[in-house]
Amino acid sequence: FRKCKILNAAIMKSSNDYLVFSDGDCIPDSNFLETHSRLAQKDYFLSGGHFPISERVSNLLTIKDIKSQICFTKKYLLKQGQPIGKNYFKLIKNQFLADVLDRLTPTRATFNGNNSSAWKSDIIKANGFDERMEYGGLDCELGYRLNNNGIKSLQVRNRTTVLHLYHTRPYKNKDAVKKNRLIRKSTIESKTTKTDFGIN
């Protein structure tokens, strides 16, 4: 599992000042990049939302469903067998209501690898992703360092969301998860602003 190393290489290869992050197991809505670009602010990173879809819905999903964006509708997901839950709020099309929900949600705005964005200069200042980390909370650890550097987080989970496809995680192991938890704890408690195990 070398996600952090790959992401750091991609960051250095990138030519834009503002970077948007997602994962290969996620389907962005049609306004994904536009929303991140429009809401970008100095001294902030954006924390988008994700909607985990079931194994059944993931298997039934087609390219046509994605291109038409029908897969981002409550009617479609319920018809395909997606369980009812609070995640459906993230599919609201009314941007005013989505903005209100983002302001009211008690959910902390963390840096999530499936849907986040930040200024490249801020990420480089924090020395990118910590390459000691494997699967399990590696993305939000970068967010903690950004916070420690004075970069605030903006909640946009209802204004832009991605569908998260179902899949197994054979790469997940308890030892790595425990190690990651300790690194995150250290980052928070010691107010670490830059990792020694990142880009440089």
Residue ranges and their predicted role:
Residues 1-14, 31:
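Glycine-rich, basic loop-to-helix element that forms the pyrophosphate-binding segment
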Residues 19:
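Short aromatic/hydrophobic "clamp" motif used to bind/position activated sugar donors
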Residues 23-27:
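The conserved acidic donor/metal-binding loop of glycosyltransferases
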Residues 31-80:
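Conserved donor NDP-sugar-binding/catalytic core segment of glycosyltransferases
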Residues 66-108:
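Short, flexible, basic/aromatic active-site loop/helix in glycosyltransferases
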Residues 110-127, 133-151, 157:
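A short, conserved alpha-helix in the catalytic core of glycosyltransferases
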Residues 124, 149, 156-173:
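Active-site donor/metal-binding and catalytic loop motifs
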Residues 159-160, 173-199:
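Catalytic core of nucleotide-sugar-dependent glycosyltransferases
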